Amino acid sequence: MSSQKNNKLQSSLNTTPPIFKQVCVIGLGLIGASFAQAIKDNGLSARLVAVDRHAPSITEAIEHGLLDAGSANLQDVIAGSDLIIIAVPVQAVQAVFVDIKQAIDNGQLASDCIMTDVCSTKVNIIDAAKAMFGSLPTGLVPAHPIAGAENSGYHARR
C-alpha cells in the first residue's frame, strides 16, 4: 500500500466514531498492551481501561495517555465495558472468568458483552468458560494473535 493510501486510510479511521463505548484489557503484557495501543491509535473505543497485577504498568500506561483508567482489581474498572480482551496466562483465565461472571451478576456488565482471549491454547479456556457460565457465552471469541520478538511486557508493545 502506498504511503498516500495508508495516510488516507489512517485519517478515515481516526475520524469515524468509536466502535466501542469502553474496552477493558485484562493483562498489559506484550499482547495486551499491543491491543490497547492499536485500539487507542485507531480511536476504536471512547474509553480504554486495563487491569494488571503489575501496578507500574498501569501507572505508566495512564501517564502516557494510553489508558483512561486502570487497576490491579478488575471490579474497579470493568463496569460498562462492551469489549473485554483477556491477555493473561492460560492458568489465570479461570480466576478472570470468576470476576467477569461476578460483574455480570452484579449488573456491571451486560451478559452479551464481547469477550475475547488472546491466550495460547483454547481447550482450557473453553472448558473454564463452560464451567463458569454454564455454557459457552455467545459473546466469547477465542483467539490467539501472533505477536512479539525477543522482548516482553508493556514496553515491548508496538
Each PLM stretch: what is its role?
Residues R53-H54, V88, V118:
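Short beta->alpha hinge that forms the Motif I/post-I loop of the SAM-binding pocket
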Residues S57, A92, K122-I125:
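Conserved short alpha-helix immediately C-terminal to the canonical SAM/SAH-binding motif I
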Residues R53, A69, A92, E150-N151:
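Short secondary-structure boundary/capping elements
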Residues S2-A79:
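NAD(P)+-binding Rossmann beta1-loop-alpha1 motif at the extreme N-terminus of oxidoreductases
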Residues L74-I114:
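Rossmann-like NAD(P)-binding element
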Residues H155-R158:
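Ligand/cofactor pocket segment of small-molecule handling proteins
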Residues D99-S152:
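Rossmann-like NAD(P)(H) cofactor-binding subdomain of soluble oxidoreductases
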